[in-house]
Amino acid sequence: MRRLLAAVLTLLPCAVHAETVTFGLDWKAEAEYGGYYQAVATGIYAKHGLDVTVKQGGPQVNHTQLLLAGRLDYNISSNSFLALNFVKENIPFRTVASMFQKDPSVLIAHAGQGNDTFAALKGKPIMISSDTRVGWWNFLKARFGYTDAQIRPYTFNLAPFLSDKTAIQQGFLGSEPFSIKETAHEEPVVMLVADAGFTGYASLIATSDKRIRENPDQVKRFIEASIEGWYSYLNGDPAPGNALIKKENPEMTDALMAYGRESLKKHGILDSGDAAKDGIGAMAAARWAAFYASVRDQGIYPAGLDATKAYTLQFVNQKAGMGK
């Protein structure tokens, strides 16, 4: 009994002193966030002294605003444009890790219509969201000569695409292609924007400069635990994370989550490029500089913007979680 009591008392300080962290996603719970749910479900965050609540996003949720208002401690910034927006607007928040080395955004078309390359889509109507219009769409305009006259609204409803064989729309690698296969029983043409040369990071974790300055240890533990969660989800048994995802978002099926996870693995979304040697979450100053130069030359951002304020390398490139 004394030994049991001693063991319990030894564990209590960890539980009592676990720091509460609220983390916002940029979309609904799905395999593209599997590493975070895996870190919660398997106790990885707890092992790092953190009590993490993951809040899913959605079309009516603006977690960036909640982060800036202090209602979230960390959130997912979808792409590098959002990080540069912080700098442009002189907002004291920045990226502390980039979980996706490749942006999983895709353009999707029907097979057999001649719409199987990015170049072939020039001048043709394409359904995209308002966020995409101010994001990687600008890369496609500069790279392939697309124009805004091609834009048609995308409302995250597949019906317009499925009813028109000439339709082209945006999507995410691990979701819309699967739904199209399941619904229409056809294999769509899927073109990964990153494969066309888009170098922006994706699924970045952002937090405040104040937190980085005043509690760098928490930031370090949160990033390292998240990275460990991702290695566990990709290379181990994803069942614990998937169970939490389904609890949060009952629309997720086992088949869809398996497809999403396999898409991440097959295309090296998390562990390619610099992450192959420096670990998931890796970032490089040279890549940030090149990305800024490209979007500056497209007129999206002004000359003289200090892109180094968009990120910090303090918590990444340390091979955290590798081999686990």
Language model feature labels by segment:
Residues 1-4:
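Positively charged n-region of N-terminal signal peptides that target proteins for export
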Residues 40-43, 48-49, 71, 76-79, ...:
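Sec/Tat-exported extracytoplasmic proteins
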Residues 285-324:
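Conserved C-terminal helix/tail region of periplasmic/extracytoplasmic solute-binding proteins
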